[in-house]
Amino acid sequence: MTIHVGDRIPEVTLKRIREGMETIDTHALFDSRKAVLFGVPGAFTPTCSARHLPGFIEQFPEFRHRGIEVFCMAVNDPFVMKAWGESQQVPDGLQLLSDGNGEFTRALGLEMDASSSGMGIRSRRFALYVDCLLYTSP
């Protein structure tokens, strides 16, 4: 079932690398904050690297000015997400999250099968505005 406006963000664990590997509970991550969460089919893929992530990087100062945190998620491992962030010069504060097994993507109902391209199950392209665990309209 696909997430709808008014639904709570599902509780699963994601990974990210900062100083070291971190395991993050999505409810702990999105509780008591306003955030944009956007998903991409894959790090280093042409459209994600040339348009999707750069668009959010460009708008990041405006989100930050409004007190909105920004998170990018993909069904990739955390090492790939870290390398992609470095290659794209992602600014501090824009966080890249790894949904390596696609659990969060499936729980959101936003998975797609890219097996025909040799990529397996991936995230659809999406953006959600989250306010204290709830998917809302900004």
Where is each model-derived feature located?
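N-proximal helix/coil linker or "cap" segments that precede and/or mark the start of modular domains
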Residues: M1-R16
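Short loop/turn microsegments at loop-to-beta-strand junctions
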Residues: P10, V36, R124-R125
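A short beta-strand-turn-helix
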Residues: L14-K34
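Conserved small/polar residues in nucleotide/adenosyl-binding loops
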Residues: T45, Y135-P138
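Structural microenvironment flanking redox-active thiols in thiol-disulfide oxidoreductases
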Residues: S49-Q89
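Short, internal strand/loop/helix patches
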Residues: Q89-G120
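A short, hydrophobic beta-strand/beta-hairpin element that forms part of a small beta-sheet core
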Residues: R125-L134
